[in-house]
């Protein structure tokens, strides 16, 4: 389950970061975040073991930290849901556009930029497409039982695995094309950045943005505790041990898949990588049919995944304003307002990497790092000033500083540009 949650489209966003970090150092940073992920999840698991009964993460937090912290967590979860919906919509719209360009207009408009200027950004094309697609999303989100969309998890994993295989199999040919057409021996700027970490610390401070992106890639904590709750209820005597082993295995698997994606995406084009490898330009202006299929596949998987982020948001708002009761009027009004508002933002602001920096820097560090560790420390009923507890708080503090700095740097970049 953890692997399923982490194995999202963010896995394809790291090639551009490898150019500034250096491939080796990005892998090191990914490893560190993977270790942090395991540490903070197991802290939440240990905190949950002290609860007699729980159904979700917020109940664990209230049990150990009180109602105030549960409200804080719910606030961040609402922000997280809104941000993810906007991020996914900002990705879905251009993915469908790239699919249309690659499949039907490749001869007339060789690049997506050409297609965008000539067709895609024309109001008479873009506006109806956005309205219709968002309307279909609203219909999907009106469903009250999330279990009816369980198939979306399988579509998502299948889309990611398929795309990963395409990138892996084709990266050798793309790297060869890069060496023959872009690599210049005398020009070091065209060389692959294997180990130079310095570029990540230049004026744009890409290190902090890259780390915030990694925090988002591993943001899975709230979603796994309902699964763990059921496991604990069924296996009360060995729940914690099994949870920790499952978390370790899933973290190793997720990190290994991230490694494969980072390496193969980087080798696809070390000199001019796209924000997402699925945006890559085909060799010799060919159609790259397998990646065309991948774009459509991922766009569809994201479309069916979005309700999974919307349902908790709707429930949180209903709990806050209607006592948890979701009437038909509330359901229809809130669904259409939320979906169209998020779509409007996504149609104007479509910087995927910046969305990931904001989510990781301002939200994930709190719901995935600070709150689980605090719940664990309070569950021990020991002074927070005890040396081992203090070390954990310092580690969390460093992660929060890195994340928030990444978010602030991203804001500064947006203001400049």
Which positions does each model-derived feature cover?
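Membrane-water interface regions at transmembrane-helix termini and the short interhelical loops
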Residues: 15-21, 134-156, 230, 344-355
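Alpha-helical transmembrane segments of multi-pass integral membrane proteins
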Residues: 1-4, 29-33, 212-213
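Extracellular loop-to-transmembrane helix junctions
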Residues: 17-47, 54, 58
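Membrane-interface recognition of transmembrane alpha-helix starts
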Residues: 1-9, 79, 394, 398
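Membrane-interface "cap" regions at the ends of multi-pass membrane proteins
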Residues: 1-16, 37-42
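Membrane-interfacial loop- and helix-cap regions that link adjacent transmembrane helices
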Residues: 42, 48-74, 86-129, 153-156, ...
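Alpha-helical transmembrane segments and their membrane-interface exit regions
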Residues: 32, 36-40, 160, 364-371
